[in-house]
Design a protein with these regions (language model features):
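Short, structured coil segments at secondary-structure junctions
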Residues: 121, 141-143
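Active-site phosphate-binding strand-loop segment of PLP-dependent enzymes
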Residues: 147-181
Length: 181
């Protein structure tokens, strides 16, 4: 019975044009990549500074692999926080002129962690409808009241703010809206 339901749902997704197929790249990490022997410029890369293939970074990663192995074997809060992590946080703090730095392994985790730290139950989060999924998930998981305003519609945002009775309001807007293509 379940297979029929899944097959039906997959068919609906395919017919709607929302069925995704992973493309197999023929190259490593770069803003340029090979796909079926043709070179493309990637607008979907997370390698924002084009450092993925920088020889200095690769050599530093090799040294870290030799020293620490492939995995920390645990989250940073349990027992996976290494001397290299600590040194990096200290160097970033010094570079930025800040007391402390907290590193997250992904932007998604950073958004979840920071939003949860800023709000509590009873607070309000008011967010743009086209925010990245990580901002939406972080808002929902924070357990604050969550409302969304129409994309880039600051009059709609103002209406929502005026209706909010909470002591603390957090307005969240993406800087580059990537979720709608």
């Amino acid at each position: 019975m379940e297979k029929k339901i899944i097959k039906k749902k997959l068919k609906e997704i395919k017919l709607s044009g929302n069925y995704r197929i992973r493309k197999i790249k023929d190259s490593g990490n770069s803003h340029l990549f090979l796909y079926k022997n043709k070179e493309y410029l990637s607008f979907a890369s997370n390698d924002y500074l084009s450092l993925a293939n920088d020889k200095r970074i690769i050599n530093a990663a090799k040294i870290a692999l030799d020293k620490h192995g492939y995995s920390t074997s645990s989250s940073a809060l349990i027992s996976g926080f290494t001397s290299s992590h600590h040194k990096l946080e200290e160097e970033i703090s010094e570079f930025l002129g800040q007391e402390k730095t907290l590193l997250f392994s992904t932007g998604y985790q950073a958004n979840l962690g920071v939003i949860k730290a800023l709000v509590s139950r009873g607070d309000n989060i008011i967010a743009d409808q086209l925010n990245h999924a990580s901002l939406i998930d972080g808002s929902i998981l924070s357990r604050a009241n969550f409302r969304r305003y129409n994309h880039n519609d600051y009059k709609d945002l103002e209406k929502i703010i005026l209706k909010c009775k909470a002591k603390n309001n957090l307005i969240i807007s993406d800087s580059l809206f990537s979720m709608d293509g």
